[in-house]
Amino acid sequence: EQGANTYDFSHDRIRNVAYAEISPARRRSLHRRVAQALEQVYGVDSDTTSAQIAGHFEQAGDIQQALMYYQRAAEVTLRFFAYQDAIAMLNHAVSLVRVLPAGPTATEFELELQMRLCTAWAAITSYLGSEADAAYTRALELCRQVENKPHLFTVLWGLHEVALYRVEYEESRALARQCLEIATELGDPGLLLEAHHAAWGPYYFLGDYDKAFEHMQAGLAIYDRAQHEPLSVHYGVHDAGMCALYESTLALWNMGYLDQARSRQARVIALAKELTLPANIADAYSYAGLFCHLLRDPQETQRFAEPALQISTEKGYPFTRILSAVLMGWSLAMQGQLAEGIALARLGMDAAEEANMRLHTSQLSAILAESLMTAGRHEEAIEVLDQGIRRFETYRDLLCASDLWTLKGDALLVLNAGYDAVEECYQTALTLARRLGAKVSALRAATQLVKLQISHGRADESRCELQEIYAGFSEGHDTPDLRFACKLLEQQI
């Protein structure tokens, strides 16, 4: 002992014995004094010691003060992307709320903690796991007990995203409409941006591009990168402005506006260079890679998939890790690194299946199948394509859906499956693509069908249809798919 109120222990065991000898009342008093001393020393700069202060207040029996500092400590850990640490701390804090008397104070404390749990679970599961759903559902229950419209907006937005990732589009749209109503009522431009962000997602994945573009344009009219990028932490773990740009890029490609799509891709790349948050950068590069795959450009695909995969792996973002792994695998396979590329693409697809991922599964299945076919593994490719077709029939992921049948026809042709089986695949692909308004996919299917018929002396059967589809393109004639179709048509003149 050094003085009446100070202690110095040179060994943990001595300290523990001495601590046990102090009476509970004295112990609580000392913890309170330590907490208050730390507050005085660090003041407003107590972020680095907030967890320590929280622990002392908890041991002092001052639960409300402990909760305030645990909340602050969780915010600090979230800023450093330490999501698991934040979740552990927040769950402990939620357990402390149970010590408080039931009432508005306890409800408000738990709501603040649950909001941060929502943020953490959304980040580390990409809305794919049950944990994010449970966190948002509990937060919604709490929002109904207190009047907090901004928190209600955030919770409804999160539940919309959970529904979107489960391809429950009607539920997603209904929640997005509620977000629009609240944002309009509050008059907050940032919330209005995120409300449009919620609204365009289900329309995009349903292929209702006119309505999706309407909300995208409304959102982009509001969007300012410096002001609104930080919102991504709470809304989608990706930047709203970037989302509008890359989803419209993919939509324009699907509709056959290829030059406009490439122009929009240039905006994606330009904005990606300005983004500051790792999750947003990984997201931007993953989607840039998806578009480069559609353009059949493995070098450019690798240019974007590689940094996206590195960031996603380091930070633990499952959704972009899956996308970038499959894309990176394809790019390597197309450039001759077959074994490494296929292994990486399969790793991504296995992770997608484990996470029960439902968005982009058609394109990802096509990517893996193309990689396998490049290596001459056509039987395996057909297995992947059949699984992709089954997923499409269940989840209706539209982009590249008809390409699954086109690729299956290509694989069957190599395996000498017979004219009728191959033609059926191409015809199915063409019919589906035309029904979905997927002009590039329709062109691909029609091109392969004409090639097949030429080889069997029956070219006139589908040549006119290919001519009609090709004539429907007013731009993008220098892209690989249009160049190949044009060459094929010229050979038949």
Regions found by a protein language model. Give the residues of each.
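Eukaryotic tandem repeat interaction scaffolds
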Residues: A345, A351, S365-D397
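Tetratricopeptide repeat
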Residues: V34, A66, A73, A86, ...
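Flexible inter-repeat linkers and adjacent short helices
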Residues: I63-F153
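Short secondary-structure boundary elements
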Residues: E1-A88, H92-P101, L372
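Surface-exposed acidic, glycine/proline-enriched linker/cap segments
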Residues: M216-L252
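C-terminal non-catalytic interaction modules
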Residues: E131, R138-E141, E383, Q387, ...
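Tandem amphipathic alpha-helical repeat scaffolds
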Residues: V17, G55, R72-R79, S95, ...
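Short coil/turn linkers that connect adjacent helices within long alpha-helical scaffolds
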Residues: V41-D47, Q59-A60, F80-A82, L100-P104, ...
